[in-house]
A protein has these predicted regions:
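Intrinsically disordered, low-complexity segments enriched in small residues
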Residues: 1-63, 94, 136-142
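Solvent-exposed loop and beta-edge segments used for protein-protein assembly and interaction
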Residues: 42-44, 81-83, 145
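N-terminal targeting and processing segments
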Residues: 52-53, 74-77, 109
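Short alpha-helical segments and helix-capping/turn motifs at coil-helix boundaries
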Residues: 32-37, 73-75, 81-85
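Extended charged/polar low-complexity repeat regions
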Residues: 68-70, 85-460
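Short, polar loop/linker segments at the starts of domains and inter-domain junctions
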Residues: 59-73
């Protein structure tokens, strides 16, 4: 948790998509990662972009498993847990970011992640606040609600709106029902006031789940969800109609995985159901479709032509731990793990393979041509950084970081050092000094946009 006086907004780990190796693995985490694969992105203002990220890393304070199954996250899986003295923001990389409790109108800023978390409850932020103008782009009801939280990683937006799902009360429930101890993503608002809305079911078996999205262009997407029992019945019907022996497909899944609680609800397809520009010309097939293993793991991705474009295989013992993935028409890339769940081997039959050896503050990467790199690290959790790299050719490069993980200096293989001076508040680079002592300066406006730069020769 967060201690009084500790920096707020510190993550439980480095970003899974940061330092990567091969196809790809994050050696600082020992995790198999897929930083981002986009399945759906129609152009327009504030468009609905459906992308998938995978990480085998397991946080100690996970959000529930999302509709893409264990290990996978999509942007809509952002979630805020409200604990007694701590706010835990679960990002779409499977990590936990820890903030101190906020009062209405108060904000927390993560310097290491460049992320603001603001609690509603005030019509305006202080005039000098970096988010004051962006705050005014929000509808008044969002700004004034102390029960909503808003997050952004830029003074230019967009806002991620964290609220709760309105639900149908039970017959014997005492009203008004208390709000849940968490907040989920209900929409996005950009700096022009345009909105993207996530429609969540108010009741029934999919209560609280996203079943529809309206983007900034007014297009409406329907997200088709399935339960484990429905997928099991479909598998039995397909087996009987094909005359095959039905596979073992359980009607229920265990309620908990290493990646969090699991209700077994999965996304099976996304349809475009309304387009104001082409209301009579809607596609007759889903824009993307997903296939699932009997254990509720993402097995396949099909595009709008119903062509399989991706396939995934998982460990028999550990649900959600990816051991192979493949692009259609290419060979499987396979992975092996140690007893701590860290990737030790990456096998590529059509290219370089890698092995990973983990020691305290040191990771050794060896490829199939017997070339070796050694990464030396400092820090823990979200502030872990690579401070020295021994390259395969014998050269060494080094880096220095400040207390919040920002880069201060880099020394190349010849011993030449370049220094970086970040702004204390924003983390933006304001000055770069090259090894010969020549300096360049950079200036920004209130929205963190670069407005001017001065070179070593004084020219602006």
């Amino acid at each position: 948790g967060v201690r009084i006086g500790a920096p707020t907004g510190v993550a439980c780990s480095v970003c899974p998509g940061g330092v990567t190796s091969g196809h790809p693995v994050n050696p600082l985490l020992g995790a198999k990662v897929l930083p981002g694969e986009t399945d759906l992105a129609l152009p327009g203002p504030l468009p609905f972009i459906l992308s998938r990220t995978y990480s085998s890393y397991r946080t100690k304070t996970p959000a529930p498993v999302g509709s893409l199954g264990p290990g996978w996250k999509m942007p809509a899986d952002i979630r805020l847990q409200l604990r007694d003295n701590t706010l835990i923001l679960s990002d779409n990389g499977g990590r936990s970011l820890y903030f101190e409790h906020l009062f209405p109108g108060e904000d927390g800023y993560s310097r290491s992640e460049s992320l603001w978390l603001v609690r509603g409850g005030v019509a305006k932020l202080d005039e000098g606040h970096r988010l004051a103008a962006l705050w005014q782009a929000l509808p008044e009801e969002l700004r004034l609600s102390p029960h909503r939280y808003l997050a952004t990683n830029s003074p230019q937006g967009p806002w991620w709106v964290l609220g709760w799902c309105e639900r149908v009360p039970e017959a014997d429930e005492v009203l008004p029902a208390p709000l849940p101890p968490y907040r989920v993503l209900t929409g996005l608002v950009d700096r022009f006031g345009r909105t993207q809305t996530f429609h969540r079911e108010a009741g029934g078996e999919f209560s609280g789940e996203i079943t529809g999205v309206t983007d900034g262009a007014g297009r409406h997407f329907r997200l088709v969800l399935t339960t484990q029992a429905q997928r099991a019945e479909e598998a039995r019907q397909q087996a009987s109609s094909g005359g095959a022996e039905p596979s073992v497909f359980p009607d229920t899944l265990p309620g908990y995985t290493e990646y969090g609680r699991d209700n077994g609800i999965r996304l099976s397809a996304v349809w475009l159901t309304h387009d104001p520009e082409y209301p009579e010309n809607l596609p007759a097939a889903p824009l993307v479709r997903y296939g699932w293993t009997p254990r509720g793991e993402l097995a396949a991705v099909y595009d709008r032509s119903n062509t399989q474009v991706r396939s995934f295989t998982y460990d028999d013992k550990y649900r959600g731990r990816m051991v192979a993935h493949r692009h259609t028409g290419r060979p499987d890339i396979r992975y092996r793990y140690d007893s701590d769940g860290r990737v030790t081997e990456q096998l590529n039959p059509a290219g370089l393979s890698y092995t990973y050896q983990y020691e305290k503050d040191r990771i050794t990467i060896t490829d199939s041509l017997d070339r070796r790199e050694v990464l030396h690290t400092q820090g823990e959790g979200g502030l872990k950084r690579m401070v020295k790299k021994e390259h395969a050719d014998g050269s060494v490069t080094q880096s220095q970081f400040d207390a919040v993980g920002g880069l201060k200096a880099q020394t190349d293989a010849a011993g030449r050092t370049t220094e970086y001076s970040p702004d204390v508040v924003t983390g933006l680079i304001t000055r770069i000094t090259t090894p010969d002592g020549r300096a360049s300066a950079f200036y920004y406006n209130h929205h963190n946009q670069l407005t001017s730069a001065t070179g070593p020769d004084g020219l602006e």
